Amino acid sequence: MPSFRFQNRRIAYTEYGGGPAAITTEGARGRTAKSAPAASRPVILVHGLLLSQEMHRPLAEDLAARGNHVITIDLLGHGESDRPRDMWRYSMSIFGEQVVGLMDHLGIEQAVVMGTSLGANTALEIASAAPGRLRGMVIEMPVLDNGLLSSALTFTPLLVALTFGEPLMKLLARGTRAVPRRLLPHYGNVVLDLVRQEPGPSGAVIQGLFFGRIAPHRSERHTFQTPALVLGHHRDPVHPFSDAGMLAKELPNGRLLEADSLVELRMQPERLTDEIAAFLDEVWGSPRAVAKPAPKRAAASNGPVKSRVTKSPVKRAPAKRAVTKRPAARKAAVAKSG
């Protein structure tokens, strides 16, 4: 797996497709595109907490088959990247720097960054620190003001188990690593990888996040001009729909897309993938000012609409926000609140 160095640590990534797609019969959904000219429509997919880039492989293949140059990344402490036990190496802002470091390494001036949960907040950190490097953002399941308490209640017991119960968790990891990957479906392995990995570094990741900011302050989010598609769903206390709706209203060029459930993009991805692909077509079809060109394969730095809902498709104007539901659910008009 290719990688680059960030603060003397290895960060792993994978590239999919781009330009005229060469479709093969390999991949998580039985198809993928493997031609990858670096200059064509780069899209970087960032995983969730303690997960790996494998969670985004099916989506990466689908978007690559539509002519995008898709890159998935394992943030430090995750997947195939280095996993140090030092909690000070982990924070949302540092994760944002790692994504920008990947862009520098690949010589990418601007990219669309899509992140899920931890990855969503990482994208917001990039919008804060390096907005000129973003062509657009796809923010799936952000964790903001309304999800903090549920997140603390969920991850504190996990942190205790990973830290004070490390010997027992190591035994559990060894046992689950004995399960052959070929016996499980793709997302079965993605979930089981949570337990297969060594517990010490995972605990350090959570500790580092607990001691840093979770996302840019809302007063700062109001200033972000990057076009954004915000995905949210109901019945999830860690990623409440209210956070997604709030963020879509805060972002001047934000748009809200309602998912049917937590797993729709993974289990029944066609509708949401179409919406994401249309958003990519939109942002790459309109010119934006670009940052100073990054050197090709340079070493990474060591430094730091909501509009009315109708049965018609969502308008593709970057400055408007729209809520998109399944066709059967598009009968009611939603008045903009706040």
Model-derived segments and their meaning:
Residues F224, V230-G232:
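Short beta-strand/loop motif that positions the catalytic acidic residue
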Residues R9-D82:
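Conserved HGGG/HGGXW glycine-rich cap/lid loop of the alpha/beta-hydrolase fold
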Residues P237-D243:
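Conserved alpha/beta-hydrolase "acid-adjacent" motif
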Residues G115-G119, A123:
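Gly/Ala-rich beta-loop-alpha elbow adjacent to hydrolase catalytic centers
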Residues N253-N302, K306, K336-G338:
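Catalytic active-site module of serine/aspartate enzymes centered on a nucleophile-bearing elbow/loop
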Residues R29, T72-V112:
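Active-site loop/oxyanion-hole signature of alpha/beta-hydrolase fold enzymes
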Residues V190-S219:
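Hydrophobic, aromatic-rich cap/lid helix
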Residues L124, S128-A129, L134-F164:
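Flexible "cap/lid" loop of the alpha/beta hydrolase fold
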